[in-house]
Amino acid sequence: MWCVAELNQQYIRKMEDVLAVYEKPYDAAQPVVCLDEKPIALHADVRSPIPAKPGKPAKQDNEYERCGTANVFGVVEPKTGRHFTTATPDRSGAEFARMVGYVVKQYPFAKTIHLVMDNLNSHTRNSLINCYGEQEGGYLWDRLTVHYTPKHGSWLNQAEIELSMYSRQCLGKRRFPDVNLLRRETQAWRG
């Protein structure tokens, strides 16, 4: 389903905030980093696929076995081209907190990290505090200047582009029966 956002004052304010962050010249002391996540359905083949042969395409049965879900984080620093993509076993506040911890460690000399992300229920200071404790979780959150995209404004998050490329180039129409294979393939795609 495609949603058309209501262009109210809140939407416009958040949109203009994100666009203003993108418009700033590059500053290593205040990098702009975009974060997004994508749920992945894990499926196993019921019958082994038949590989391609000269003159014959590969064949894969449309029947599959459900094996749960996983999550993929995409992080992009648009001004430098740096990007990180990683698979996690689930979409939780703890996984989000670990990803933010990883991002903060990548920028040890930054005064603040401008983090553009959507307003998902786990994208909060509490997720970091629950994972790392009050002191470290609070410290990590305080290293960020958070810029939430407006509701139905995910197109403003440049990490969406990263995850779109990942979906086409890495996932394609392949099936991943477990998060370990998904992690290995994600790491190989990331290079």
Where are these predicted regions, by residue range?
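Electropositive, glycine- and tryptophan-enriched low-complexity nucleic-acid-binding patches
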Residues: K53-K111
